[in-house]
Structure formats: structure tokens, C-alpha cells
Amino acid sequence: MSTPRQILAAIFDMDGLLIDSEPLWDRAELDVMASLGVDISRRNELPDTLGLRIDMVVDLWYARQPWNGPSRQEVVERVIARAISLVEETRPLLPGVREAVALCKEQGLLVGLASASPLHMLEKVLTMFDLRDSFDALASAEKLPYSKPHPQVYLDCAAKLGVDPLTCVALEDSVNGMIASKAARMRSIVVPAPEAQNDPRFVLADVKLSSLTELTAKDLLG
């Protein structure tokens, strides 16, 4: 029988897990794409973009419907700026976030954030909700060659926390994020959106919850 792993750190995703920002990213993306003359009704032609870095999403659009004018990087910056302003307007903290972070601290765990969003957005969001001091390390995939589902952002966060990835539990809402955390060899907790709860791919996770309000110490530690 294998020895249970010791969990020393919990690493959270941000978009869709801490804040209900996925609809805001969608809105920002579609607003900007429509302003470029892109036919946004063809969005269903794109693969599953949940959890992907925004430059990867912009590249997918460009491959199908190239536009004239602003560079892809400029378009990425427009989408990010729009998404941040929507987050500031709506302040969409999800239920159970403060309690989940507090539970991790009560269990003596280090707490990290690993996100595809830009570092300045991570800082802004945590500060907005008075959560910055609860996080021991932040890692962004913004400047990495590959973002989720590649594990690098999780490996970077574990390194910043000073722990082995095998001693981490990752909390995610997306399949791409779950794959990234499992590729980093972490314990995996998923909290899918209601419409994704029955996605069979989430069978790869160690624990599946319908809300962070359900999180227990046993879920974290195994």
C-alpha cells in the first residue's frame, strides 16, 4: 500500500475559481473581436478555451479570421484591459473563497496562486478583495512559452513556495487547469462550473466539488 503524500501547500487558480471572471473574459474577448470586424457568431468553431491564456485564444481567432489593423499583441492588451475593468465593476468573488483560504491556513499550508492571467491582474484582484496577505506566492503564465494545460506555471508556483510539487494540492475549475496540475504531479481538486459538472474528463481529479463552500481538510490533505 502506498504511503499517503504529505501536503504542504495549496495552490489556487484564479479565473473561475476565486472570481467568476470567465463570463467577463468571454465578454471582453467578444467585445474586442467584434470591434475588429470578426464574426463572433463563429466562436463555436474554436476548441475548448476555458483556462487558456488570452494570447492563445486570440491566436485561435486570428487563425480562422485574420483581421487588418492592430497586432495580435495589441488585441491581447485590449482584451486584458477590458476584462480588468469588468472585474473592477462587478467584483465577482465566488462563494467560499475566504473560508477556503482560511481553511488552508488553519491546516498550516502555504498558499499560492497559479494563473494564466497577467501578474498585475493577480495582484489587483487579490488586493481588491483584501486577500493579498493570505497568499505566500503568485505565479503567472503570462510570459511563459506555454501556459495551461502545460504544468510550468504550477511548477513555478511550487518553486516560489519552496516546496516539492508532489507536496502540493491544486484547486481548479477547468479541464486545462486540472491537466496542468496533474502533469505537475500535484493532488487535484476541481470545482467545475455548473454547466461543466458532468464533463467526464474530471474523473482525473482526486476530488470534485460543486462549490468551494464544500471544501474540507480531508479534501485538501487526502
Curated annotation (Swiss-Prot):
EC number: 3.1.3.68, 3.1.3.22, 3.1.3.50, 3.1.3.23
Gene3D superfamilies: HAD superfamily/HAD-like, Putative phosphatase, domain 2
Pfam families: Hydrolase
Binding site for a divalent metal cation: D13, D15, D173
pH dependence (UniProt free text): Optimum pH is between 6 and 7.5.
Reaction catalyzed: sugar phosphate + H2O = sugar + phosphate; 2-deoxy-D-glucose 6-phosphate + H2O = 2-deoxy-D-glucose + phosphate; D-mannitol 1-phosphate + H2O = D-mannitol + phosphate; D-sorbitol 6-phosphate + H2O = D-sorbitol + phosphate
Residues bound to substrate: D13, M14, D15, S115, A116, K148
Any one Gene Ontology cellular component term annotated for this protein: cytosol
Enzyme class: hydrolase
GO terms, molecular function: 2-deoxyglucose-6-phosphatase activity; glucose-6-phosphatase activity; magnesium ion binding; mannitol-1-phosphatase activity; metal ion binding; phosphatase activity; sorbitol-6-phosphatase activity; sugar-phosphatase activity
Cofactor(s), names only, from the UniProt record: Mg(2+); Mn(2+); Co(2+); Zn(2+)
Cofactor: how bound: Requires the presence of a divalent metal cation for activity. Can use zinc, manganese, cobalt or magnesium.
Disruption phenotype: Cells lacking this gene are much more sensitive to the presence of 2-deoxyglucose in the growth medium than wild-type.
Catalytic residues, chain numbering: D13 (nucleophile), D15 (proton donor)
This protein's UniProt keywords: Carbohydrate metabolism, Cobalt, Hydrolase, Magnesium, Manganese, Metal-binding, Zinc
Entry's transmembrane regions: none
Family, similarity comment: Belongs to the HAD-like hydrolase superfamily. CbbY/CbbZ/Gph/YieH family.
Free-text function comment from the UniProt entry: Sugar-phosphate phosphohydrolase that catalyzes the dephosphorylation of D-mannitol 1-phosphate and D-sorbitol 6-phosphate. Also catalyzes the dephosphorylation of 2-deoxyglucose 6-phosphate (2dGlu6P); this is a biologically important activity in vivo since it contributes to the elimination of this toxic compound and plays an important role in the resistance of E.coli to 2-deoxyglucose. To a lesser extent, is also able to dephosphorylate mannose 6-phosphate (Man6P), erythrose-4-phosphate, 2-deoxyribose-5-phosphate (2dRib5P), ribose-5-phosphate (Rib5P) and glucose-6-phosphate (Glu6P) in vitro.
The protein, known as: Hexitol phosphatase B
Source organism of this protein record: Escherichia coli (strain K12)
Gene encoding the protein: hxpB
